[in-house]
Amino acid sequence: MKLLRWCKANAMPVIAVLAAAVTAVFVPPDAAYLGYYDVKTLSCLLCVLAGVGALRRVGLFPLLAQRLVQVFHTTRGAVTALVGITLVGSMLLTNDTALLTFLPLSWFVLERTGQTKWTALTFILQNCAANLGGMLTPFGNPQNLYLFNHYNIPNGEFLSIMLPPFLLSTALILLCCLFLPREGLTVPRQETLPDKRRTAVYGVLFCVAVAMVLRGIPYWLGLLVIVMALLVLDRRALLGVDWGLLVTFAAFFTFSGNMARIEPVRELFRKLLTHGAMPVASLTSQVISNVPAAILLSRFTDDYRGLLVGVNIGGAGTLVASLASLITFREYTKHVKGQTGRFMVLFSAISFGFLGVLLVAMTLWMR
């Protein structure tokens, strides 16, 4: 029973490891396995998560968010601010970390102001903001970090590729926020202040992580500095890293590497990708999630522009299209009981609506 509960709580890494194990039956482990793993991507992801975790532990993000929300005095204004914070946060913190940080804050605000009836819509819009807002930066989404390093995409080109879908996504999110009422409310205040010295040090460590991602410093140097610093200053920040996400990445590297060596699979994806990387990436993401889709399809195409856009807009749609969406679902069911069906209907309507608009618009844009 305990094992079953643990597997349910860690569904994605468990599924990823099982998928890798199944492919290992067809491609037995050999020396080629060592070439599957992108150590730079794993190192950068670890350092970003650790840096953000340290800042989160000193209470910086909830304080900044609450101060911003206090500027607004209506349901529409407060929720729009919370969604906006999540969108901006996802560009800097990664989408899953932004959701883990700001979804609890949204529940806190909605509950204390008697507006819990808007929890589903607020959480869903925050989910869209995290998944689609994070597309603008190389470290905003895990799949971005992988593709950015795998194809060695220049910083300026990455921004030029992702800016159009980002702007359209932002406009769609803000449009949805207009459906919220302009009821007056009082937002609760938090007076607890983070330790300024520790916050400054952790801020520097986070900047080191960003410099790693943007190739400003060698990744091994950044990894050494951040890990050694946190071992001394805050070991819990390291222990609190989402190790399941790192295991998931490593397992999917194995899965995609093996799949690329199975000839019928290679032939299938070669044929599919003749129809364009973007639609194939978007649709593949709906079934196996956008992170493994990015890793798998990168083995078969050099069209990194289409693949990058495809796996990012492919984060909208089904609940499994993005790993971060499972965080939103888990947070909602933790706070709101007996309304899972209503949540899924609203989630599907909004998420598939976003996917449809973005897919059509970007197909026309990239012709």
Regions found by a protein language model. Give the residues of each.
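Transmembrane helical segments that form the transport core of multi-pass membrane transport proteins
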Residues: 36, 58, 62-67, 205-302
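Hydrophobic transmembrane alpha-helices that form the pore/transport pathway of multi-pass ion
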Residues: 82-132, 295-308, 337-339, 363-367
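Membrane-interfacial loop-to-helix junctions in multi-pass transporters
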Residues: 39-41, 70-83, 112-123, 197-200, ...
